[in-house]
Amino acid sequence: MKKITYYLSLFIIFSCANESEITLKKFEGSPEFQEAKLSLNSFDLNENSAYDFSFNVENYQLGDQTDGAGVNGLANSAQGQHIHMIVNNGPYSAHYESEFSKQINEGKNLILFFLSRSFHESVKNPNAFTLMQTGGVDNDQPYDLSSEFLFYSRPKGVYKGADTKKLLLDFYLVNTEISPQGNKVRATVNGKEFIIDEWVPYYIEGLQIGEVTVKLELINSNGELIDVPFNPVERKVTLE
């Protein structure tokens, strides 16, 4: 009996040692790019049923490596700074030039573009994004672009090796602010809930190898879900 108790104690100690606590902390130190600007010049449906987008980018260099890349512990794009494109709050596509084509499903689509650092942290200033929509004709009512929106950006996809240690949690707010007294973002990571009241990037630590589920919700001061399109949003990523 003593031997069984001994091995059980060892198992509990070993299990606890291998279960790390999930934490969420502010990520600080990135260049701010407060003068960076992204504006849409044109978008046209081409003969291949894809959209051709043309942007004007000011005070920001696409393709450059952002200061801090490679030393801040975050997954980084070797292709440098880019534009994130999010359609209907789905996973973003990254674009490294100011002109590109993208296939988009027919029907009503809400599309957000914003400038991104090479390690996928969004540039958060009033001129660094463009919000638009396609479709919304006939009986399909268009989106109200003045509504409050929460867009999910990171984490995304598959993380390997050292990139699994620290995951960037980043989202984009449009037509709303978050604060201790006002709206907030509720982030749930593998069942652990965090209430966010400051729009800054964060990083997640303490995750185990395997599948990670991240859910983001825009909530009001009473903790109630705000009834706007694509809220809440949930995403799964994999750590290998």
Region annotations inferred by a language model:
Residues 51, 55, 105-117, 171, ...:
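Short, well-structured beta-strand segments within conserved domains
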Residues 89-97, 191-199:
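Short beta-strand segments within Ig-like beta-sandwich modules, predominantly Fibronectin type-III
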Residues 46-53, 65-71, 161-170:
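Short coil/turn motif common to extracellular beta-sandwich-like domains
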Residues 12-15:
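C-terminal motif of bacterial Sec signal peptides marking the signal peptidase cleavage site
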Residues 83-85, 183-187:
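Short beta-strand elements bearing conserved aromatic residues within extracellular beta-rich modules
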Residues 39-40, 57-74, 156, 171-177:
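Short amphipathic, basic-aromatic surface patches that mediate peripheral association
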Residues 19-48, 136-161:
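Short, compositionally biased P/S/T/A/G/V-rich stretches that sit at domain boundaries
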Residues 92, 116-125, 194, 219-228:
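Short acidic/polar inter-strand loop motif in beta-rich domains
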